[in-house]
Amino acid sequence: MDLSSLTGKSAAAGGATSAERKEAIKQQVSSELAMANAQQLITKATEKCYSKCIPAPGASLSGKEQTCLTRCMERYFEAFNIVSSTYVRRVSNERAAGAVAEAGL
């Protein structure tokens, strides 16, 4: 029985394998979070646009309702993309400013 995994001390090859597993888990968690966020975005957009565009549900959608849903979903996703890219840019700028400030110390 190899106890090196319990002590945290391992051979170089074992360390690489552990690092690879850790990276694979990070990637899987990241992927699952992205999927959950996408599902949440679609659900929210559907709820908002459905309540706005379909006042009285029926057996089928009218042309007006279909057009409204299409436009509403497009605008919702466009707004999400604008907000998301602005947020990412802002966080990136703040990190860069923080790195510059740390380097100056």
From Swiss-Prot:
Q: What is its main location?
A: mitochondrion
Q: Where is this motif: Twin CX3C motif?
A: 49-72
Signal peptide bounds: none
Would I find Phosphoprotein among this entry's keywords? no
Stored InterPro entries:
Tim10-like, Tim10-like_dom_sf
MF terms (GO), sorted A to Z:
metal ion binding
A single GO CC term, please? mitochondrial inner membrane
Membrane topology type, per the record?
A: Peripheral membrane protein
Which compartments does it reside in?
Mitochondrion inner membrane
Q: List the disulfide bonds.
A: 49-72, 53-68
Q: Does the keyword Metal-binding apply?
A: yes
- Name the segments for region: Disordered: 1-23
Entry keywords, A to Z: Chaperone, Disulfide bond, Membrane, Metal-binding, Mitochondrion, Mitochondrion inner membrane, Protein transport, Translocation, Transport, Zinc
Compositionally biased region (Low complexity): 1-18
Annotated GO biological processes are: protein insertion into mitochondrial inner membrane
Family matches, as Pfam families: zf-Tim10_DDP
The record comments on the domains as follows: The twin CX3C motif contains 4 conserved Cys residues that form 2 disulfide bonds in the mitochondrial intermembrane space. However, during the transit of TIM13 from cytoplasm into mitochondrion, the Cys residues probably coordinate zinc, thereby preventing folding and allowing its transfer across mitochondrial outer membrane.
Q: Which family does it belong to?
A: Belongs to the small Tim family.
Outline the subunit composition: Heterohexamer; composed of 3 copies of TIM8 and 3 copies of TIM13, named soluble 70 kDa complex. Associates with the TIM22 complex, whose core is composed of TIM22 and TIM54. Interacts with the transmembrane regions of multi-pass transmembrane proteins in transit.
What does this chain do?
A: Mitochondrial intermembrane chaperone that participates in the import and insertion of some multi-pass transmembrane proteins into the mitochondrial inner membrane. Also required for the transfer of beta-barrel precursors from the TOM complex to the sorting and assembly machinery (SAM complex) of the outer membrane. Acts as a chaperone-like protein that protects the hydrophobic precursors from aggregation and guide them through the mitochondrial intermembrane space.
Protein's recorded name:
Mitochondrial import inner membrane translocase subunit TIM13
- Origin organism of this chain? Mycosarcoma maydis
